[in-house]
Swiss-Prot record:
Site location (Cleavage (non-hydrolytic)): G189, S190
Active site positions, chain numbering: S190 (schiff-base intermediate with substrate)
EC id: 4.1.1.65
NCBIfam families associated with the record: PRK05305.1-1, PRK05305.1-2, PRK05305.1-3, PRK05305.2-5
Function: Catalyzes the formation of phosphatidylethanolamine (PtdEtn) from phosphatidylserine (PtdSer).
Subunit structure: Heterodimer of a large membrane-associated beta subunit and a small pyruvoyl-containing alpha subunit.
GO-annotated cellular components: plasma membrane
Disulfide bonds: none
GO molecular function: phosphatidylserine decarboxylase activity
Organism, as annotated: Rhizobium rhizogenes (strain K84 / ATCC BAA-868) (Agrobacterium radiobacter)
Name this polypeptide is given: Phosphatidylserine decarboxylase proenzyme
Pathway: Phospholipid metabolism; phosphatidylethanolamine biosynthesis; phosphatidylethanolamine from CDP-diacylglycerol: step 2/2
Enzyme class: lyase
The entry's keywords: Cell membrane, Decarboxylase, Lipid biosynthesis, Lipid metabolism, Lyase, Membrane, Phospholipid biosynthesis, Phospholipid metabolism, Pyruvate, Zymogen
């Protein structure tokens, strides 16, 4: 293993969307330290926390079109049958929804749950309730993606939270996606909902921790053995 690869395995990169925030915190630390030296160390700690928040680690993603991978780091806050948001145009029949809540200490880079092609992106303005509340799915600001997969269309909804006030989407309509590919980011606490068509069986339970790009949250068909994975 090369020295460069060794360093990469130890130091987790910061996503480019976090650069302005990390730089801002560091400059503020210098200014505060000039006024009162102990404040520099407080500012430096906040700078390191900001870099930690915007971390963008590589993940090992299973390459199986029958598996759905977690789109976010966080706690599974809901596994239930509900009607998908109207703006996704997924119909009015209940679909399996798996919800993942991200607190301010979780990695907030969002990933595609499955391989497919984006057929729709719909943004909706809304409130900024605690994203862990069930009603946040209906009332909060959100950005929804519809992905055409081998098993039909799935919906992936980025939901803003009490602190989060900015949803970022990195992809466009008609763009192909691999499972685990980065699709967006939500700043400072939020939630991801994934809607599955008939045939999907949940593979997680409420309260379970999920890792974006790695944890299997749903599966189509019968459970299988080990699968091939790739870095994402």
């Amino acid at each position: 293993m090369s020295l460069l690869n060794s360093v990469r395995n130890v130091i987790v990169p910061v996503h480019k969307e976090g650069y302005p925030f990390v730089a801002g915190f560091f400059v503020a630390s210098l200014v505060l330290g000039w006024v009162f030296k102990p404040l520099f160390w407080i500012g430096l700690i906040l700078t390191l926390w900001c870099a930690y928040f915007f971390r963008d680690p590589e993940r090992m993603t299973a390459q199986d079109d029958d598996l759905a991978i977690s789109p976010a780091d966080g706690k599974v806050s809901g596994v239930q049958m509900v009607t998908p948001p109207a703006e996704l145009n997924l119909g009015t029949e209940p679909m399996l929804r798996v919800s993942i809540f991200m607190n301010v200490f979780d990695c907030h880079v969002n990933r595609s749950p499955m391989r497919g092609r984006i057929t729709n992106i719909a943004y909706r303005q809304g409130s900024f309730l605690n994203a862990e509340l069930d009603k946040a799915s209906e009332q909060n600001e959100r950005n929804g993606l519809v992905i055409e997969t081998k098993h039909g269309e799935i919906g992936v909804v980025q939901i803003a939270g009490l602190v989060a006030r900015r949803i970022l989407c990195f992809v466009n309509v008609n763009e192909p996606l691999d499972a685990g590919e980065r699709i967006g980011l939500i700043r400072f606490g939020s939630r991801l909902d994934v809607f599955f068509p008939a045939g999907a069986e949940p593979r997680v339970a409420v309260g379970q921790r999920a890792i974006a790009g790695e944890t299997i949250i749903a599966e189509f068909g019968s459970p299988k053995g080990p699968t091939v994975s790739r870095r994402s």
